[in-house]
């Protein structure tokens, strides 16, 4: 699973997920999966979608993951009273704004890419859309 090797601080404020995304263009591959909605992806969801795509394209072509879970999410154990500090880090998430390209693919046909991205999108909690590289 993806997570940072080192961080400056162990825990992070909750924060807000506002604004528009950077990384809105398909830059590495020919096809991409772009987020339409706003939310957050856990490292497990990112990995599950990657596995679904990789299995569908049967090791042909190449996949790029354009998101990285760099925000720690903490939680307190069950049946623990309030107070006594912030809980332990349970998992890592990546905050997603609308327009962010999540995955890219190259070396496969458009039909196969659409099918693979549809399988990946079913694993994600966001609305997504299929995009192609724009050549100028």
From Swiss-Prot:
GO annotation (BP), single: translation
Domain of life, per lineage: Bacteria
Pfam families given in the database record: Ribosomal_L16
Record's GO cellular component terms: cytosolic large ribosomal subunit
UniProt keywords, alphabetically: Ribonucleoprotein, Ribosomal protein, RNA-binding, rRNA-binding, tRNA-binding
An example Gene Ontology molecular-function term: rRNA binding
Subunit note: Part of the 50S ribosomal subunit.
Stated role: Binds 23S rRNA and is also seen to make contacts with the A and possibly P site tRNAs.
Name of the featured protein: Large ribosomal subunit protein uL16
Natural source organism: Shewanella sediminis (strain HAW-EB3)
The organism's taxonomic lineage, starting at the top: Bacteria, Pseudomonadati, Pseudomonadota, Gammaproteobacteria, Alteromonadales
Gene field: rplP
């Amino acid at each position: 699973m993806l997570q940072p090797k080192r961080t400056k601080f162990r825990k992070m404020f909750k924060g807000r997920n506002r604004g528009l995304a950077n990384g809105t263009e398909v830059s590495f591959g020919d096809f991409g999966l772009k987020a339409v909605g706003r939310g957050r992806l856990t490292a497990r969801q990112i990995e599950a979608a990657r596995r679904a795509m990789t299995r569908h394209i049967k090791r042909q072509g190449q996949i790029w993951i354009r998101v990285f879970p760099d925000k720690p999410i903490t939680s307190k154990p069950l049946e623990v009273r309030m107070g006594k500090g912030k809980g332990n880090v349970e998992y890592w998430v990546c905050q997603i704004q609308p327009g962010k390209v999540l995955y890219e693919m190259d070396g496969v046909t458009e039909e196969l890419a659409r099918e693979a991205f549809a399988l990946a999108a079913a694993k994600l909690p966001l609305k997504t859309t299929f995009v192609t590289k724009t050549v100028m």
